[in-house]
Swiss-Prot record:
Signal sequence segment: none
Region called Disordered, residue ranges: 151-196
Phosphothreonine modification, residue list: 160
Keywords assigned by UniProt, alphabetized: Cell cycle, Cell division, DNA replication, Mitosis, Nucleus, Phosphoprotein
Top-level taxon in the UniProt lineage: Eukaryota
Any one GO biological process: DNA-templated DNA replication
PANTHER family xrefs: MINI-CHROMOSOME MAINTENANCE COMPLEX-BINDING PROTEIN
Cellular compartment(s): Nucleus
Comp. bias regions, Polar residues: 151-161
Name the UniProt record assigns to this protein: Mini-chromosome maintenance complex-binding protein
Length: 642
């Protein structure tokens, strides 16, 4: 069995070793998973693994061990593949068993031929996910992961082979002319496939089919391939992810960290071209639909590489400054949380000061912004999401770049975010809701296909009078449903499918927002900088990177703290509510009490308290009184408009 660092550069060799030892006994599959799991527990081992998020694809060695941080954008139908297949040597008639797991192309040695009728062959099933880089991931998150990755300096991992000088366009060309790769693949190949796994055979046939396949592929690639990213301007690779175990544990929009075998074999493009060609010959009337589905589900490997997953982990968060898993049972995680909680008070005070400056001197608005940024849906009662705290920051300066720069500040604090400029034109034209394309048999992404814990800033300050058309009304309704119910109804043409979410929504507006909000806070600037960009840039440059990192840890960590109300505290709150109603029955309603409890919850968590104290309850009441008084004052100034 290969040893040393071969698990990084030749993972299939490791798999072959276990398969050779165990044969058809399925225990070899469990041993493979356990082997890589143990390898990744070694000191800093995950940092040695090249990441598709950070390393250009053409630097990575085919069939090497890689990782990928991504979101499941779509799930394709399960596919069958040859789990075990048998080859026969044409000269000696010797028979050899091979594994098909973690492969797209079956490997055959010289003079070997695949025996399709072998009784020892087995068919297995795997699931394919279409995965994209995490939408809206902040640049500081990407930079931190790049800086932490040690794969580039690892002497045992070479991903600058002879391919490293080829351009991106050359990669596409290699897909169209796989015969160029013949020397890199000893043994012979034949373009063909069965049950999701392609096999090898006679080399001469490959060359002739490659030339005919080249023309077909050129036609298919004449229009750019849509990588189906939910947000505009996103970069990074999309991947077809082959999952072999426990795929029922994952769902669309989950954020994953994957470890597996990279497959970028150019032969795949030729094989897929042949399948499209064969479909057209069988039924020309249906060839268009089938070709579109084939194009989407089997894009060129140079554009959409394949990852055969050995290990997959659903991520609680993507903040690189925290342990990946915030597990109470894990000592490292507990130690990290304990150490940070001991310095929570000064971090909160500094963050409050920082946000007060960002909000032009308004400390009350800064308090509510902190509560908003640490809020999260912690449970659902029937259809009602508990813990959401959408804030409408009204009173934003008109004809100013304030909202744009405020969003920049938020981008520097949270791991993932997106700013939606709410104009009539955008509402009428943007595709917010994902929809099913039945021709291509895929889920077409929309702007609201976002992973949990994303910060969505909706900027209404650019909204002017105009007419919403039908798509515009649907988009506004989708935003309202997202805010109220924390769900997005994806369009499947014949029906809508509900996708629950956990998105922090901040609405910036001049007057009261057109959209529903849990809390409206009217901004009262204490200063109006003559140059907003210069002011905000100065604010960011004045904060030490170490302090900024503490803000980032603070805002992520507090979302995962448990919070409970004891029976005594619940009784005290109820009694206080009754007393407030006695003094002025009109001053507080059941909805006001619910709002007060939400504010008290996040206020307690913001200081590291996991239950409600009398001090925090009184502070929450004081904040709410100040906020309402400010709204009332603004109402008297502007009439009914807030």
């Amino acid at each position: 069995m290969p040893c040393g660092e071969d698990w990084l550069s030749h993972p299939l060799g490791i798999v072959q070793g276990f398969f050779a030892q165990n044969g058809v006994n399925p225990d070899w599959e469990k041993k493979v998973i356990e082997y890589f799991k143990e390898k990744l527990k070694e000191n800093n081992a995950p940092k040695w693994v090249p990441s598709l998020n950070e390393v250009p694809l053409h630097y990575l060695k085919p069939n090497s061990f890689v990782k990928f941080r991504c979101m499941i954008q779509d799930m394709f139908d399960p596919e069958f593949y040859m789990g075990i297949y048998e080859t026969v040597n044409q000269n000696t008639k010797a028979r050899v068993l091979h594994f098909g797991k973690y492969r797209d192309v079956a490997e055959c040695g010289p003079q070997q031929e695949l025996d399709l009728s072998s009784p020892r062959s087995t068919t297995s099933e795997r699931q394919t996910f279409y995965c994209v880089p995490v939408p809206g991931e902040s640049s500081w998150v990407k930079e931190a992961y790049v800086n932490a990755n040690q794969a580039r300096v690892s002497p045992s991992t070479s991903y600058t082979p002879s391919r490293h000088k080829r351009s991106y366009e050359d990669d596409e060309d290699m897909d169209l002319q796989p015969s160029k790769q013949k020397e890199q693949h000893p043994g012979s190949r034949q373009a063909g496939g069965l049950g999701g796994l392609h096999w090898c055979g006679e080399p001469k046939r490959l060359e002739t089919e490659a030339s005919s396949g080249q023309q077909l592929n050129t036609l298919n690639l004449s229009s750019p391939f849509d990588l189906n990213f939910p947000l505009p301007g996103e970069k990074g690779p999309a991947c077809l992810v082959k999952v072999y175990e426990d795929w029922d544990c994952f769902k669309v929009n989950d954020v994953l960290e994957l470890y597996g075998v990279l497959s970028v074999d150019p032969v795949l493009s030729v094989l897929n071209s042949e399948e499209r060609d064969a479909s057209a010959l069988l039924d020309p009337m249906e060839c268009t639909d089938m070709a579109e589905e084939q194009r989407v589900h089997s894009p060129p490997a140079s554009l959409v590489p394949r990852i055969h997953v050995i290990l997959a982990q659903k991520l609680q968060h993507i903040n690189p400054l925290l342990p990946t898993c915030l597990n109470k049972e894990e000592s490292r995680s507990c130690q990290f949380v304990s150490n940070f909680m001991s310095e929570l008070s000064p971090v909160r005070a500094e963050l409050l000061g920082f946000l007060t400056h960002a909000l032009l001197g308004d400390s009350l608005a800064a308090e509510y912004l902190i509560l908003h940024l640490i809020s999260t849906v912690y449970t659902r009662r029937d259809v009602l999401p508990l813990g959401k705290f959408t804030v409408n920051l009204s009173g934003c300066p008109q004809n100013s770049t304030f909202t744009e720069h405020l969003y920049r500040i938020i981008q520097h604090l949270v791991p993932a975010s997106f700013r939606l400029q709410m104009t009539i034109e955008n509402m009428n034209q943007l595709k917010l809701i994902p929809h099913k394309d039945y021709t291509a048999n895929r889920l077409v992404s929309g702007l609201l296909q976002l992973p949990n814990n994303t910060s969505l800033v909706i900027d209404e300050t650019l909204l002017e009078q105009g007419q919403l058309d039908t798509p515009g009304v649907h988009n506004v309704t989708a935003l309202s449903n997202l805010i109220t119910w924390q769900k997005v109804d994806y369009d499947f043409s014949y029906h809508q499918m509900e996708f629950p979410c956990n998105i922090n929504v901040l609405i910036t507006s001049e007057g009261r927002s057109l959209l529903p909000a849990d809390c409206q806070i009217h901004l009262q600037p204490q200063l109006i900088p003559p140059n907003m960009e210069e002011y905000m840039n100065g604010l960011l440059s004045a904060v030490l990177p170490s302090v900024l990192n503490k803000f980032r840890i603070y805002l992520t960590l507090l979302r995962f703290l448990d919070y409970n109300l004891s029976d005594d505290i619940t009784k005290a709150v109820e009694d206080d509510f009754v007393e407030m109603r006695k003094d002025d029955p009109q001053s507080i309603t059941a909805d006001d009490l619910h709002q007060l409890l939400v504010v008290a919850r996040f206020l307690s968590l913001s200081v590291g308290q996991t239950t409600l104290s009398r001090e925090r309850w009184l502070r929450a009441k004081q904040l709410e009184l100040s906020r309402k008084a400010r709204l009332q004052q603004q109402k008297s100034v502007n009439g009914n408009e807030l």
